[in-house]
């Protein structure tokens, strides 16, 4: 059975004319992406928002747009600037966790601004939740310029400007159990596990663990899931939400991610699958640190 889900979280809304911060906490963007970033700027202005770009968007040497401390400082400047009403990260890759020691979590905790990012920003989003209890949105705003840009733009504007819920309305199906309730943590499985053994990993107790992945076939997923099991995550959580696992699905890998997960967890642990969140350009959003109730 496929049902629709709206996660019912109230996020800080934006208004026409609001300034939003655009930055890259992870890998710098390739210079060849400049035209895409300019298109994104135009779309955001058409929606009615005023994007303010970090000085560290594009890579300078190798993957780096700036040092970890410099990238963290930009994020904190956006939090401190009262004219900036929302913060959107457009990067991904590998190096976002480097900024974590340089963030002022007290300022973040007391800010009404919502942070948006995906993939490698899983590290920042979960660290912010662990340190502050503050929710963030797992979503890539660059989706506004890709294959499904028309629908993405409609859903984004409906949710962020018009106080709708389209961006968070998901299709799902239970593959185990029929009900789950809890605060959502997680994101990209590889990036979440960078936090293992650090002060930034959220507590798994009674949480709903969301997982997705872009790269990796059976061997990598088996490794990641084994690590989560050895961390005790599967004994503590109240449910699992599986997003898309792009390479696994494209390669039609067997066993599937669903089978791998079910082999690692108790038979009474609820598991939900959604095709709507992950690295696809049609992906929607989920709030990490937000409470969610799902029923078959």
Segments and roles (model prediction):
Residues 36-37, 67-72, 223-228, 253-260:
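Charged helix-capping and loop-helix junction motifs
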């Amino acid at each position: 059975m496929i049902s629709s889900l709206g996660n019912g979280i109230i996020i800080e809304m934006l208004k026409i004319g609001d300034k939003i911060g655009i930055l890259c906490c992870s890998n710098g963007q390739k210079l060849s992406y400049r035209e895409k970033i300019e298109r994104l700027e135009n779309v955001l202005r058409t929606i009615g928002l005023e994007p303010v770009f970090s000085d560290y968007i594009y890579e300078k040497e190798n993957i780096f747009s700036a040092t970890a401390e410099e990238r963290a400082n930009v994020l904190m400047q956006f939090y401190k600037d009262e004219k900036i009403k929302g913060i959107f990260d457009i990067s991904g890759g590998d190096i976002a966790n480097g900024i974590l020691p340089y963030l002022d979590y007290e300022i973040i905790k007391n800010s009404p601004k919502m942070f948006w990012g995906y993939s490698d920003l899983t590290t920042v989003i979960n660290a912010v939740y662990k340190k502050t209890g503050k929710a963030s949105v797992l979503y890539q705003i660059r989706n506004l310029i890709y294959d499904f840009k028309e629908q993405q733009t409609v859903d984004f504007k409906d949710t962020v400007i018009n106080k709708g819920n389209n961006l968070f309305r998901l299709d799902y199906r239970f593959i185990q159990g029929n009900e789950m309730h809890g605060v959502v943590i997680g994101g990209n499985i590889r990036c979440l596990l960078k936090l293992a053994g650090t002060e930034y990993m959220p507590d798994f107790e009674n949480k709903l663990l969301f997982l997705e992945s872009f790269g990796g076939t059976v061997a990598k997923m088996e490794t990641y899931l084994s690590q989560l099991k050895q961390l005790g995550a599967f004994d503590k959580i109240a449910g699992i939400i599986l997003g898309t696992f792009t390479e696994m699905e494209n390669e039609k890998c067997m066993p599937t991610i669903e089978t791998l997960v079910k082999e690692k967890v108790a038979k009474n642990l609820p598991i939900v699958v959604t095709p709507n969140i992950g690295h696809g350009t049609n992906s929607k959003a989920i709030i990490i640190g937000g409470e969610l109730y799902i029923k078959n």
